[in-house]
C-alpha cells in the first residue's frame, strides 16, 4: 500500500475548491495538514477565514495559519500577520504582525515583504525607518508584488 502523499491531498483539495466543493476540500486539506504539509494547513485557515465549507471562525483560521507558518509556508505566515494587524481572531498586535510578515518575507512571500515595508514606512509595530521600508518594498517587488513596485516608483 502506497504511503499517503500530502501533496496529492493538497492538489485534490485545490481541485475541490475550483469545483466549489468546500466540504470535500476541507477533508483533503485536513489530511495534508495532518501529514505536516503547510499548504494544507494554510488552506484550512482560508476556509475558516472565509466560512467556506465550515462555519466562519477566525480563531481557527489563526490556528491553522500558525501551523502552516510553523511548517515554513510563507502564505500562512502572511495571513497570520494580517490577522494580528487587523485584530481578527486574535488580539490586535502590530509587533506580532511585523514578526509574521518578516517570517513570510524570509520565506519569499512577496506580500509579507510589502506589508512589512508599509509597517516600517508608517512606524507601526516597528521603529519608523524609510530606508528599511524601501528595502522591503524592493524585495517584495522582486518577488512579484506589484503594489510594492508602485510604492518604489512613487519615491
Sequence positions of predicted segments:
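Terminal, low-structured helical/coil segments at or just beyond the last alpha-helical repeat
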Residues: 1-6, 139-155
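Alpha-helix N-cap/N′ positions at the starts of helices
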Residues: 4-8, 24, 99
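Short helix-capping/linker turns of helical repeat alpha-solenoids
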Residues: 4-5, 16-17, 21, 35-38, ...
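Hydrophobic face of amphipathic alpha-helices that form TPR/SEL1-like repeat modules
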Residues: 8-18, 41-50, 79-86, 115-122, ...
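Short, charge-rich amphipathic alpha-helical segments embedded
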Residues: 30-43
Amino acid at each position: 500500500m502506497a504511503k499517503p502523499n500530502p501533496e496529492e491531498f493538497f492538489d485534490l483539495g485545490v481541485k475541490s475548491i475550483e469545483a466549489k466543493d468546500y466540504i470535500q476540500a476541507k477533508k483533503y486539506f485536513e489530511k495534508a495538514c495532518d501529514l505536516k504539509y503547510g499548504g494544507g494547513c494554510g488552506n484550512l485557515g482560508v476556509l475558516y477565514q472565509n466560512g467556506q465549507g465550515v462555519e466562519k471562525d477566525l480563531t481557527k483560521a489563526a490556528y491553522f495559519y500558525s501551523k502552516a507558518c510553523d511548517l515554513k509556508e510563507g502564505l500562512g505566515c502572511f495571513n497570520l500577520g494580517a490577522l494580528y494587524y487587523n485584530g481578527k481572531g486574535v488580539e490586535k498586535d502590530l509587533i506580532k504582525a511585523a514578526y509574521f510578515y518578516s517570517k513570510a518575507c524570509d520565506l519569499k512571500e512577496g506580500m509579507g515583504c510589502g506589508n512589512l515595508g508599509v509597517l516600517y514606512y508608517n512606524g507601526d509595530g516597528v521603529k519608523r525607518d524609510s530606508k528599511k521600508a524601501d528595502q522591503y518594498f524592493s524585495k517584495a517587488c522582486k518577488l512579484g508584488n506589484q503594489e510594492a513596485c508602485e510604492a518604489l516608483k512613487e519615491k
